[in-house]
């Protein structure tokens, strides 16, 4: 087994295979739902619209590009994030996708000075962590494709 991605903390839990299968389209394709009654879009997928309480929803794929709204850089390793190894700093951002949906996601493979509010980002598929049964969990992160600063009022 390769030691390229060694874990610092042993994971005592493993994600449910059934749950992982059910959530795969959201995790890998940014698939959410759109309400057929009021047109509201949601991510992750929902069974009931949070705007009008309708159950008449359809699956929709959100765009893989968006704009950073807010940035949080964590320089301290915390015990809450088991299985993430030495990924310091952890850069969490609030991203508004091009269709208006807002999500929380990490930014990776980008110089710190380019991770600012208003920067354009694009989704990439990355290894997140290794489960206790030695399988890899994949998911989405974002990389900066254009710099920028939000103007006043954003």
Task: Label each region the model flagged.
Residues 1-30, 139-141:
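A broadly conserved sequence feature marking short terminus-proximal activation segments
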Residues 29-32, 46:
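Residues immediately within or flanking Cys/His clusters that coordinate Zn2+
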Residues 34-37, 48-54:
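Short, cysteine/histidine-rich loop/knuckle motifs that typically chelate Zn2+
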Residues 43, 56-58:
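Short functional micro-motifs and their immediate structural scaffolds
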Residues 66-69, 107:
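Conserved hydrophobic positions within beta-strands
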Residues 71-76, 128:
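Short, conserved beta-turn/loop elements at beta-strand boundaries and strand-helix junctions
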Residues 109-122:
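Short nucleic-acid-contacting surface segments enriched for D/E, G, S/T with interspersed K/R
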Residues 126-154:
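OB-fold/S1-family single-stranded nucleic acid-binding modules
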């Amino acid at each position: 087994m390769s030691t390229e991605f060694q874990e610092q903390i042993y994971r005592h839990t493993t994600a449910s295979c059934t749950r992982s299968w059910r959530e795969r389209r959201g995790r890998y394709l940014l698939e959410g739902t759109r309400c057929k009654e009021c047109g509201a879009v949601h991510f992750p997928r929902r069974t009931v619209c949070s705007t009008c309480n309708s159950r008449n929803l359809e699956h929709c794929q959100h765009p893989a590009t968006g704009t950073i709204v807010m940035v949080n850089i964590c320089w301290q390793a915390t015990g809450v994030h088991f299985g993430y190894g030495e990924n310091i700093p952890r850069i969490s951002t609030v991203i508004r996708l091009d269709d208006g949906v807002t999500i929380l996601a990490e930014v990776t493979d980008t110089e710190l000075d380019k991770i600012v509010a208003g920067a354009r980002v694009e989704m990439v598929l990355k290894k997140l962590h290794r489960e206790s049964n030695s399988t890899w969990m994949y998911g989405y992160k974002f990389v900066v494709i254009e710099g920028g600063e939000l103007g006043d009022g954003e």
